[in-house]
């Protein structure tokens, strides 16, 4: 098939590579403009652009697409059979939806209709799901509401973070998109409506999502920490300074304490949760300091017996 591929981050790269390997004609790659990134704020090309250029593919990086007449004319001249959209980061306008015969096909990193939105991987982990997957779907004018084409699923190991899950779902989704295109061409894939009664949302993450609410259960706090890696992570306040909890573990203790209260025992640091359970902090970072193991932190900081996190 003649394709236009729209994608930006590393998550989209395996799908682009799989389409090329399957022999599809990727006539154009559309990606977001180069942006400053990292501590030095160096202007970097998106991973999809780097992959496309290495493969000798033409690349465009429009700032806007909805009313971009030059971009529209370019796509109309290509007349693609399908437009593939994987983590592109832009809402696809109606004129693009109407252009190709097979439509605009999206790889979404959840088992739709669950976790529609910008952060499906993070929210699936944060909500304690034990199974997730990838869905190919035909994009419509709603938010991840289009007809589903194919799905594949995988287990989420109990200690896995969203950051670790990202590349696994990217690799799972790549052959799924290739299979979807083959099925559409052969007439063996039947679009399926989503069950609105089963739909849940996975909205874009904010800094506040990472703030630890100690009234939650130990499992909830732990799952949110796993889900919100690498950003916004899990953080709280200690002595008026931001304390980032880089690594934590489920823990068992016999004693009880008010939510947020800390206990230090044998060089280990624990805090109480809303259900009476405990979590252990293994690695942390106090505002203005470097990231460190808890053992190093406790060597240089003495916590009073009634220390409470969150203040």
Swiss-Prot record:
Belongs to the Fmt family. GO terms for molecular function: methionyl-tRNA formyltransferase activity. One of its GO terms (cellular component) is cytosol. PANTHER family: METHIONYL-TRNA FORMYLTRANSFERASE (PTHR11138), METHIONYL-TRNA FORMYLTRANSFERASE, MITOCHONDRIAL (PTHR11138:SF5). The gene is fmt. This is Methionyl-tRNA formyltransferase. Gene3D superfamilies: 3.40.50.12230. Its EC number is 2.1.2.9. It is an enzyme of class 2 (transferase). It comes from the Bacteria. NCBIfam families: fmt (TIGR00460). Keywords: Protein biosynthesis, Transferase. It catalyses: L-methionyl-tRNA(fMet) + (6R)-10-formyltetrahydrofolate = N-formyl-L-methionyl-tRNA(fMet) + (6S)-5,6,7,8-tetrahydrofolate + H(+). Attaches a formyl group to the free amino group of methionyl-tRNA(fMet). The formyl group appears to play a dual role in the initiator identity of N-formylmethionyl-tRNA by promoting its recognition by IF2 and preventing the misappropriation of this tRNA by the elongation apparatus. InterPro entries: Fmt, Formyl_trans_C, Formyl_transf_N, Formyl_transf_N_sf, Formyl_transferase-like_C_sf, Met-tRNA-FMT_C, Met-tRNA-FMT_N. Pfam families: Formyl_trans_C, Formyl_trans_N. (6S)-5,6,7,8-tetrahydrofolate binds at residues 110-113.
């Amino acid at each position: 098939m003649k394709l236009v591929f729209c994608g930006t981050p590393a998550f989209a790269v395996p799908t682009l590579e799989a389409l090329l390997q399957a022999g599809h004609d990727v006539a154009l790659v559309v990606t977001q403009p180069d942006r400053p990134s990292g501590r030095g704020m160096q202007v970097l090309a998106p991973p999809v652009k780097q992959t496309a250029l290495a493969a000798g593919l033409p690349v465009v990086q429009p700032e806007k697409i909805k009313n971009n007449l030059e971009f529209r004319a370019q796509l109309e001249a290509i007349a693609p059979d399908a437009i593939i959209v994987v983590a592109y980061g832009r809402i696809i306008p109606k004129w693009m939806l109407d252009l190709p015969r097979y439509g605009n096909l999206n790889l979404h990193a959840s088992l739709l209709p669950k976790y529609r939105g910008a952060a499906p991987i993070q929210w699936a982990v944060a909500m304690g799901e034990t199974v997730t997957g990838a869905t190919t779907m035909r994009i419509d004018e709603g938010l991840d509401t289009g007809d589903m084409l194919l799905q594949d699923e995988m287990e989420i190991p109990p200690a896995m973070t969203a950051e670790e899950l990202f590349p696994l779902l990217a690799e799972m989704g790549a052959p799924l998109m290739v299979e979807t295109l083959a099925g559409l061409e052969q007439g063996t894939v039947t679009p399926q409506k989503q069950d609105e009664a089963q739909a849940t949302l996975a909205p874009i993450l904010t800094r506040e999502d990472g703030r630890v609410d100690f009234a939650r259960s130990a499992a909830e706090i732990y799952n949110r920490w796993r889900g919100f890696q690498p950003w916004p992570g899990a953080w709280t306040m200690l002595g008026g300074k931001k304390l980032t909890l880089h690594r934590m573990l489920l823990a068992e203790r016999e004693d009880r304490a008010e939510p947020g209260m800390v206990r230090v025992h044998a060089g280990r640091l624990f805090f109480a949760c809303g259900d009476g359970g405990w979590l252990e902090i293994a690695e942390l970072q106090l505002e203005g300091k470097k990231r460190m193991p808890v053992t190093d932190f406790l060597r240089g900081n003495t916590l009073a017996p009634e220390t409470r996190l969150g203040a």
